[in-house]
Amino acid sequence: MTHQTHAYHMVNPSPWPLTGALSALLMTSGLAMWFHYNSMLLLTLGLMTNLLTMYQWWRDIVRESTFQGHHTLVVQKGLRYGMILFIISEVFFFSGFFWAFYHSSLAPTPELGGCWPPTGIHPLNPMEVPLLNTSVLLASGVSITWAHHSLMEGNRKHMLQALFITISLGVYFTLLQASEYYEAPFTISDGIYGSTFFVATGFHGLHVIIGSTFLIVCFLRQLKFHFTSNHHFGFEAAAWYWHFVDVVWLFLYVSIYWWGS
């Protein structure tokens, strides 16, 4: 690395992809164990492994980018392309859930009563908690944009304030979603309606939690003066991801909550 004559970052061997894959296996197996055998041991182990992996992987990336200067303009360009491709893959991921929903709702089978929502299902009122959730996420989209503009202008105080507001709104959204799940008059086992509703909104909720974690890391980094107006890709990637989560929710709200009810 001392005699490097190019702008690319030759990454050192890292154990974190392996421990990350292991934690994913433990969490998915743990979910199955929790659903079928009411045991949370494997799920807890998976979550702990995942959190430790995230902490140490993020620590390495922060060290390489902020303190060692490995994230040159060329490397940042590659990271941008990577994040864009990741978000595109997420678009296709959610497209599958929308496909399942519309496939079932546009031509409901006789087993469902020939109608949508199926006979016996009482859907949630889209003008109550779901509408509040929509306004909360839209407000968070405004505040994350405010944070980005403040960072570009070098206004650290406003950037931290806006980022804190965004994180708070993300946590509030998660709490509202949890209360909605708790009070819902149907479950994930209530046929195709319950399956599509909880899988689509549940995966979106998981993405909100991931996005909130991403923003919390950015907030802690900004407290330590890691970002400048021309070197802040970590925050930029978090903002892109958050806007993606916002847009997915709008489609979910219109499709599943409003039209689907």
Curated annotation (Swiss-Prot):
The keyword Mitochondrion applies. Residues 35-40, 106-128, 184-190, 257-261 are mitochondrial intermembrane. Keywords: Membrane, Mitochondrion, Mitochondrion inner membrane, Translocase, Transmembrane, Transmembrane helix. The keyword Electron transport does not apply. InterPro entries: Cyt_c/ubiquinol_Oxase_su3, Cyt_c_oxase_su3_dom, Cyt_c_oxidase-like_su3, Cyt_c_oxidase_su3-like_sf, Cyt_c_oxidase_su3_a-hlx. Pfam families: COX3. Its EC number is 7.1.1.9. Residues 1-15, 67-72, 153-155, 224-232 are mitochondrial matrix. One of its GO terms (biological process) is mitochondrial electron transport, cytochrome c to oxygen. The chain crosses the membrane at residues 16-34, 41-66, 73-105, 129-152, 156-183, 191-223, 233-256. It is an enzyme of class 7 (translocase). GO terms for molecular function: cytochrome-c oxidase activity. It catalyses: 4 Fe(II)-[cytochrome c] + O2 + 8 H(+)(in) = 4 Fe(III)-[cytochrome c] + 2 H2O + 4 H(+)(out). It is found in: Mitochondrion inner membrane. GO terms for cellular component: mitochondrial inner membrane; respiratory chain complex IV. It is a multi-pass membrane protein. Belongs to the cytochrome c oxidase subunit 3 family. Component of the cytochrome c oxidase, the last enzyme in the mitochondrial electron transport chain which drives oxidative phosphorylation. The respiratory chain contains 3 multisubunit complexes succinate dehydrogenase (complex II, CII), ubiquinol-cytochrome c oxidoreductase (cytochrome b-c1 complex, complex III, CIII) and cytochrome c oxidase (complex IV, CIV), that cooperate to transfer electrons derived from NADH and succinate to molecular oxygen, creating an electrochemical gradient over the inner membrane that drives transmembrane transport and the ATP synthase. Component of the cytochrome c oxidase (complex IV, CIV), a multisubunit enzyme composed of 14 subunits. The complex is composed of a catalytic core of 3 subunits MT-CO1, MT-CO2 and MT-CO3, encoded in the mitochondrial DNA, and 11 supernumerary subunits COX4I, COX5A, COX5B, COX6A, COX6B, COX6C, COX7A, COX7B, COX7C, COX8 and NDUFA4, which are encoded in the nuclear genome. This is Cytochrome c oxidase subunit 3. The gene is MT-CO3.
